Structure formats: structure tokens, C-alpha cells
């Protein structure tokens, strides 16, 4: 297996995505076709809230997949960012959603 280093160009690509989109979900698959249960749950939460979000399919780009883990110092996918700030994965999203906190952040 080849090791992928998180390069400055990968970090710059991630920062560009975050700068251009207020709500970003780095996920496995797309919002139309999630490829894992956690990504499906994260997508469903955001769709239920009715917020527009930008999805990034990490399965299509190994550099982004590894780079986003390093960028946010978070080991798993999906990862939700709101206004360039890492919120967390699907478990944290669900907890915040059930408490009404995620809806407040997305107003």
C-alpha cells in the first residue's frame, strides 16, 4: 500500500473548498448516493434541517481523504464543517441535531 502524504497543495485545496462553501460535508459517496451508513445519516440530518451543503466524495480522491483527516485532526469520515470550523462526524451531528444545537448553528 502506498502512503499518501498530506501536501501543501492538498491542504490548499481543502481550504479553498471550505472558503467557498459555508457548509461542507466530507463524506463517502455523494449526498445523492452515500456509500456508508455514517455518511447517509449525516446527509439525512442536513437534508432534514433543509440546509444547502457542499458534499465532497472522499472515495474519489485519496489525497483529500487522507488530507481532511490530517487537516481537522479527526480520524474518521464523514466530517462536517460549518464556516470553516470542524463540527465532527455523524455521531456528534446526531447528538447536536437531537438537542437542537445543529439547527441553531445553521440558521
Set out the residue ranges of the language-model regions.
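Structural motif corresponding to alpha-helix initiation and N-cap regions
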Residues: 7-11, 61-65, 99
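Thiol/disulfide oxidoreductase modules built on the thioredoxin-like
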Residues: 70-76
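Thiol-based oxidoreductase modules, predominantly thioredoxin-like and allied folds used
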Residues: 50-65
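Acidic beta-strand-to-loop metal/phosphate-binding motif
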Residues: 26, 79-83
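Non-catalytic, surface beta->alpha helical segment in thiol-disulfide oxidoreductase systems
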Residues: 82-107
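Thiol/selenol-based redox catalytic cores and closely related redox-interacting motifs
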Residues: 3-10, 77, 86-87, 91
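Local sequence-structure signature of Cys/Sec-based thiol-disulfide redox active-site neighborhoods
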Residues: 15-52
